[in-house]
Amino acid sequence: LDRRRPLAQWLTSPTNSLFARSITNRYMGYLMGRGLVEPIDDMRSTNPPSNAALLEALSQDLVANKYDLKQLMKTIMTSRLYQLTSDSTALNASDRRFYSHYRVKRIPAEPLLDAIDQATGVKTKFRNLPLGTNATDLPDAEYPNYFLTTFAKPRRASVCECERMPDENLAQALHTLNGDTLATKIADAKGRVAQLIESKVSHEEVVREIYMAALCRWPSDSELSLSNEFLAE
């Protein structure tokens, strides 16, 4: 008898609202910088959500879509709430709970390393795993990587979300500026920078490709002008 099967069936049962609410709250926290319930793993009756109706609606939608997490992310990310500006006003500058403006948040260690790999065109090799494995796909904490450790990837010693420390520190700044993670990838002979130099494309094309690879958008006119001036020097 596989006891995991009835457990999974109970967790995902439409009658078990706790699981759907917990998953929904976590994804709100990951995408919005703050969950409807905070801390995001402290789901209890004495810690009510900031917007109970929204949590209930998203949870019911998750159940209706058979716990399709991609659909949940799509629902959140195509909402007006997710697309609000991060610029605050005099009226909402102090708001940290009700999503009156988008909350700027730091990218966690794993997707940050994956983003660097994408921007530079050089994949990180993890021990005993095939080249091309993303940091976000690591099965457990038994794959040491200095960058991930420096940027607070948790050791998964507990189930508490508090194990991942969101605060910046000096070691992260120094490693970004002087460490070998970025420097090695930028200088890689098979990386994006080397390929752009070898292709002999214009400065404008170089800037456009790097912006798209790093930020998933084209540079603005002012950014393009400033970057062209820098490359011309």
What residue spans do the PLM features occupy?
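Generic structural signal for residues positioned in beta-strands
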Residues: 6, 98, 115, 134-137, ...
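Primarily short, surface-exposed interaction patches in extracytoplasmic proteins
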Residues: 1-128, 154-164, 183-233
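Structured, non-catalytic alpha/beta "coupling" segments that mediate domain-domain communication
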Residues: 168, 176-186
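Long, His/Glu/Asp-enriched segments that create or flank divalent metal/ion-associated functional microenvironments
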Residues: 120-123, 127-129, 136-137, 141, ...
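Amphipathic alpha-helical surface "interface" segments used
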Residues: 134-142, 194-200
